[in-house]
Amino acid sequence: MVQITKGKFDGLQRLSNDKGVIAALAIDQRGSLKKMIQQAKGTENKKDVEDFKQLVSEELTPYASAILLDLEYGTPAIKARHEGSGLLTSYEKTGYDATTPGKLPDLIEDLSALRIKENGGDAVKILVYYDPDEPAEINEIKYAFLERIGAECRAVDIPFFLEPITYDATVTDSGSLEYAKLKPAKVKASIKEFSKPRYGVDVLKLEVPVNFKYVEGFAEGEVAYTQDEAARHFEECSDLSPLPFIYLSAGVTSEMFHKTIQFANQHNVQYSGVLCGRATWADGIEVYGKQGDDALREWLRTQGKENITSLDKLLDEGAVPWWTKYGSFEDVHVVEKQ
């Protein structure tokens, strides 16, 4: 049996579908989305980013249990979402300061967990870049940072979703074969660390533990893992986490993310859903940039809808309810926050 405070429980339920699975859409990208729209359209305008997010939210949240948004460009999209769709809100600043080592995180100055909750947020989401092999003087800063977020979320009784993005300080190309060989150990180390109760994390938003570009049978060139090795990494990560976890799409194509989730399904991985971003909507950016709002809306109603509903079918086949890590639904004991 596990005790969960009412605010956290209610938030998790609002973010889940009727099976307890988090089938969520992510569009909290800021700097990267701005650049993508600018490249497609040839102009830079905050309203373009807001409008793109709003259209995606309006058209695709009827098929998502929740949406992840930011308050910098996402307020119109928050208002436009389907009434049954929960809301995760980003608390961290976009990107990191490249002039200092360690990819240190920072928070949006005029935001707090309380303000996120007051704005209708059902959960706080934090992204942190993490290399378990960085020196202690860097990682201790990140650990303390996340301890503070956990305490803040506990204080206002809102779920805390943590997204650790792994990297290696010496291998700078995260898409390389060299990093692909390091990635499984890095992801496992992040699960071990951030599952500790001291951080107060409720759901881990995880990278898949391998780069599918280098999995035998999926790779077009060099191979870093056999399919059996890849399956073992998935299973070990699943077993390592005492917390519910969901997968992020990490910028891959819709087709590749679907193959990834199929692979997880085939190996009985206990994941509780996805937060899928660019894999769902990225191809609509070119349509929006070249042809405008109406063309994007049409694309979202056809290809965008197909991307998300076909993923929903895969989740129906393989994802488990968020409470599975705690046993059954009856094993979750909801208590009032003291």
Swiss-Prot record:
Alphabetically ordered keywords of this record: Lactose metabolism, Lyase
Any one of the GO BP annotations: 6-sulfoquinovose(1-) catabolic process
Alphabetically, the GO molecular function entries are: 6-deoxy-6-sulfofructose-1-phosphate aldolase activity; tagatose-6-phosphate kinase activity; tagatose-bisphosphate aldolase activity
The chemistry this enzyme catalyses reads: D-tagatofuranose 1,6-bisphosphate = D-glyceraldehyde 3-phosphate + dihydroxyacetone phosphate
Using the UniProt record, name the top-level EC class of this enzyme in a single word: lyase
- InterPro entries in the record: Aldolase_TIM (IPR013785), DeoC/FbaB/LacD_aldolase (IPR002915), LacD_aldolase (IPR050552), Tag_1.6-dipho_adolase (IPR005927)
Q: Which PANTHER family match?
A: SULFOFRUCTOSEPHOSPHATE ALDOLASE
Q: Which NCBIfam families match?
A: PRK12399.1, PRK12858.1
The protein depicted here goes by the name Tagatose 1,6-diphosphate aldolase
Report the source organism.
Listeria monocytogenes serovar 1/2a (strain ATCC BAA-679 / EGD-e)
